[in-house]
Amino acid sequence: MLEKTYDSASVEPKIAKAWDEANAFRAGANAKPGAETFTIVIPPPNVTGSLHMGHALNNTLQDILVRFERMRGKDVLWQPGMDHAGIATQMVVERKLMENQLPGRREMGREAFVEKVWEWKAESGGLIFNQLKRLGASCDWSRERFTMDEGLSEAVLEVFVTLYKQNLIYKAKRLVNWDPKLQTAISDMEVEQIEVKGNLWHFRYPLEKGVTYEYPVAFDADGTPTEFETRDYIVVATTRPETMLGDTGVAVNPEDERYKGIVGKHVILPIVGRKIPIVADDYADPTAGTGAVKITPAHDFNDFEVGKRCGLRAINVMNIDGTISIKENEDFLEGLSHPAALHGAWDRLEGQDRFTARKIIVEIFEEAGLLDKIEPHKHVVPHGDRGGVPIEPRLTDQWWVDNKTLAQPAIASVREGRTNFVPKNWENTYFQWMENIQPWCISRQLWWGHQIPAWYGPDGQVFVEKTEEEALQAAIQHYIAHEGPWKAWVEEKLENFAPGEILTRDEDVLDTWFSSALWPFSTLGWPEQTPELARYYPTNVLVTGFDIIPFWVVRMMQMGLHFMKDDAGNPVEPFSTVYIHALVRDKNGQKMSKSKGNVIDPLELIDEYGADALRFTLAIMAAQGRDVKLDPARIAGYRNFGTKLWNATRFAEMNGVKRDPHFLAETASLTINRWILTELANTARDVTAALENFRFNDASGILYRFVWNQFCDWYLELLKPVFSGEDEEAKRESQACAAYVLEEIYKLLHPFMPFMTEELWAHTAGEGEERDDLLCLTDWPEPEFRDDAAAAEINWLIDLVSGIRSARAEMNVPPGATASLVVVGANTSTEARLDRHAAAIRRLARADEIRGGDVAPKGSAQIIVGEATVCLPLGNLVDLAAEQARLEKAIGKVDAEMERIDKKLSNEKFVANADPEVVAAERERKAELDVQLASLRTALTRVSEAG
């Protein structure tokens, strides 16, 4: 006998062990001969990571697809792996060294530090894989890959060297997001936009040689200037005074009448003494600030573009740690006359932290009478998400990928339908990014990662090869072939050769996303032409979140199309479908964050409710394009769904239900059995179609309704008289049919609730028997039995009883009270149905009499079923006066709440200023109250008529 309650804590490890021992998830498990492949590569979690709700949703959806296709007999590979997570991992290990009072990274040196990282990875990395197994992820764990393992490192070298030799990777000086704390370039994804309360400082920049102009200070009603003042300066507004040391221009809008007369003139930059031009550029907004913008090309992304358009110099005035560097800065000093009067200011600023320098610069402007005003100003400041400090746009030499060239085939692939996004609207995000794509900075100033395969000769000449030996050969050929100052030097070094004397390797490593971009084919063995690569590439679907479309999806498309070709040499997409899931938010629709204290830990949910309940909740809430609002109460509710199935299996077992391997749906004779078999076929068809179209919420919702409503609430309830009756043949058929339907339910539910269904599958094998296969390796249900007449008859019965029950509930009829039913307008077919199902109607609808009538009794509740009206006279069932008073009171309460909500929603300030989630919740509540009010008023009308 099945245990009384399902204990997820004991069942889940047992089932996981059974899967593991059976190699149930290996590539090709359960594949039929000649089966087509189905491949998914897991978005590789960081080696430092632990399971969060985003992982739980992402991997639940992948696992549903993988288990579904494996049961359909496809040759399935779900490829697992981890990302080396450059910055995150380096920070973790550095923190560990500090906690253990060991020498820091720089003290121990690069080689020793990298060894420490590998040691940490062996001891502590990969925790998330065990957590994914707890969730039930059915990856082929024997094929686990890591972005720093030997095979993937070979792929990275191959791609870098190839792209470099195709002029698609190059080194150049451009602006990057620079983290002064970590002292490395970081990607846009590692930048967090944080709103801060700051200031807008208005500085006066004096015009050169006493040049003046008339500046409007008063205007008439039409905006025409009526009063002017003569100025020998221009006012610029900035939130970052410390960058003014690197200003090389002032921009005004070419249509701005205030400044047209001084475009082309120059100002003398205070503190610095540099003469810089006033230029006309559309970037300057006449309505913002003073309309004049200081241009610092080396410290602002927009200014960098203005500088390129207007031919302005880019002068970097900061060190890599964000301190000021001017006194020995050749770029800064170029063209300056070094007046002694400025040296004092330079001394005050040299070496200061950028924010300290900000205060000093404001003081100097104020002392010189050049501080026009200070305005409080809320604005967004980009911060490094790891270092936690404001990032600094920094002009620096880095390695870049020519994204624009690589983007063209990837744009065409989606536009021509070879790769499709689901939901389709995400294609707009993809195109928007691709069509405005910028060069990709791929170098990072870290030690943990793929070191860039570039070596420099004594004159700075770069040699890019896979190995130092190959780079050395290229260098020798280069220097020996060219008559020049370095030829003799190289020849001399070769005579007494020592490694590292001729070439010096680039110290930078590659952006983590570089190796991740190769994930779909590098994990299958590329650049080797392995059997796995031939078999499982391209992959079928990528399941991922929308936030990494630009950083990962785009780059996998670019690299896949560039490096993977079919037999005819045509580019091959890495996946045919990209399924984009939404965010998991808290129950109020707020994004989860530690600062808000609303982070939900999936492992805690698994501990409390079981993995199946969490998985089913995520699936049923994963409507395309709609964020998941996760309330633990919902998980408790779907745990109850599992309990319902568990109890249904126990009930069936107690009533002699056991599998009959010889049962055939076509041989069922009872209408009730033919009905459930028809509904089973409909359910299997609809669930299959929903999963094929990535409608996870529809698939799980269909299963929920079939299992809870049709099978448990109706089928088993209607079978009770059969199980307790004298007709042994009907009993045997129903027992076999119920067992068959339960087995099909386990199969259909398995992708969503794998642990419980696997346990039930094993338990219901039969006394003393074992299943031939694990449930995860059985065939997906494809029942075809249909009996529309039987389905129509039982669904008619369900509609009738449900209608009566609803009317009784609405009218507050005591649960134990029995009532007469009067049926008006029934045809002969309905009359026959009423006769056949009279016993069930009496039992389930609490009816003591069913009779025909010509008209509906006054004041009766009326239920339309087909052509007939079933009437429930109320006079003898309820205290009409008390019920009328109850309903009027309830209507009053609902009216009052509706009035409160209407006042709120009609308040423009509330709608404009309240959180969108709060406004949406009020609107949802109003819609609920509308329905409730209509129901109460209908009930009141019935009571009034009955009285």
From Swiss-Prot:
Positions of short motif 'KMSKS' region: 591-595
Sequence positions that bind ATP: K594
GO biological process: valyl-tRNA aminoacylation
Coiled-coil intervals: 879-943
Catalytic activity: tRNA(Val) + L-valine + ATP = L-valyl-tRNA(Val) + AMP + diphosphate
Motif 'HIGH' region, residue numbers: 45-55
Cellular localization per UniProt: Cytoplasm
Functional description taken from the UniProt entry: Catalyzes the attachment of valine to tRNA(Val). As ValRS can inadvertently accommodate and process structurally similar amino acids such as threonine, to avoid such errors, it has a 'posttransfer' editing activity that hydrolyzes mischarged Thr-tRNA(Val) in a tRNA-dependent manner.
The protein's name in its UniProt record: Valine--tRNA ligase
